[in-house]
Amino acid sequence: MSEVIEMHTGSISKLNDYVAWVRFNNNSYVNLEQAIEMRDKGLELFQGEKYFGLIDTREVFTNASNEALQFLANDDKLSKFCVAQAIVVDNLAVSMVANFYTKYIKNNKEVKTFNDIDKAMKWLETKKTLLN
């Protein structure tokens, strides 16, 4: 794994050549400013190449403002480069936020929630054609 970039709400690192692994600090709250930071750090990490986001919320409680969720779902820059997202959850509260993000915000066509990180990675592997 490559360098780990620390953010206000957690960290992001390259799991491999095309997967950004996003981890959250426990009890973190993502507002618009932090959502922009997450986008910018992901774009910086992959230097203009398309990539997948593996959003790992296991073993933590995290929440986000509606404004942050709307931004992450609808930002043109993020949509252009982060072409699929797998969100891994292991608790009901975070699962509800993830389900809202995946089902009710229009632009999230290639976003899915999982309870198992291996299943999330397998799903991302099926999306490799989006990287072209």
Label the predicted regions.
Residues M1-N132:
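Amphipathic, Lys/Arg-enriched alpha-helical "gate/interface" segment within cytosolic domains
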